């Protein structure tokens, strides 16, 4: 299977702080990769370099096997990369359709009718429930997230990055999102999920890549790993969670770490 994106020895520093150090990572087309790590491990910084928010100090980014230079989100879009951030970048007083086409040529008049038609086609293809004419301020958080995803797909994204996408969702909304992401994978898109939730990693992804303190630890097949292994990769030591039964008269379970 062909690689959609590859990172080779990517490093990023902020002053004396090393956010990412010689990180190597690859994601294939038609694959969901979970980027796992504790808070501060460098996950979002790494993805922000792919999406054009930051520029790496050193290293290479390859799209479809060719080295590229990404200095802005506009550059990222030109390479069919879309990132859905935790904090949505939408204009509240605009409709879903207006946000999706914002910045494109001919976004008014006849072209808007064609844009709306395309938005509906994308929604039907991936199972989104979106009203193109609904104002953003009238939407729930999950609906706003849907607009961001459709916006990326509308602009041709084949590589989608989602930063902690379930942090604002209910369990039912999370289940619905995962169904959509699997459809994208089956359609040949590369999907990267930034997360620290182990149970979601194991239920959704095909592979898991782990970062610790800004460094790449390794990548494992989801079907061949478990929470204990992933936790050890995240923190650098074994942590076993065992429930030990206390004396009967206390009737209290103790968590031993």
Task: Write out the residue ranges for each language-model feature.
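Glycine-rich phosphate-binding loops of nucleotide-dependent enzymes
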Residues: 2-257
């Amino acid at each position: 299977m062909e690689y959609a994106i590859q990172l080779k020895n990517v490093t990023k520093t902020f002053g004396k702080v090393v956010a990412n150090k010689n990180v190597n990572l690859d994601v294939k087309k038609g694959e969901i990769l979970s980027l796992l790590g504790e808070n501060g491990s460098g996950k979002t910084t790494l993805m922000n370099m792919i999406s054009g928010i930051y520029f790496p100090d050193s290293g290479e980014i390859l799209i479809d096997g060719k080295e590229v230079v990404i200095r802005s989100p506009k550059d990222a879009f030109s390479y069919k990369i879309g990132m859905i951030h935790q904090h949505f970048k939408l204009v509240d007083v605009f409709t879903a359709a207006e946000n999706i086409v914002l910045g494109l040529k001919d976004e008014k008049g006849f072209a808007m009718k064609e844009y709306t038609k395309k938005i509906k086609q994308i929604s039907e293809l991936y199972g989104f429930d979106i009203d193109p004419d609904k104002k953003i301020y009238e939407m729930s958080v999950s609906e706003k997230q849907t607009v961001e995803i459709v916006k990326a797909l509308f602009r041709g994204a084949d590589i989608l990055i989602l930063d902690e996408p379930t942090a604002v969702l209910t369990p039912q909304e999370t289940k619905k999102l995962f169904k959509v992401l699997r459809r994208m994978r089956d359609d040949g898109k590369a999907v990267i999920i930034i997360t620290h939730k182990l149970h979601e990693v194991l239920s959704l992804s095909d592979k898991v890549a782990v970062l610790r303190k800004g460094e790449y630890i390794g990548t494992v097949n989801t079907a061949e790993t478990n929470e204990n292994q992933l936790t050890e990769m995240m923190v650098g030591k074994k942590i076993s969670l065992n429930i030990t039964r206390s004396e009967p008269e206390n009737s209290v379970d103790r968590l031993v770490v």
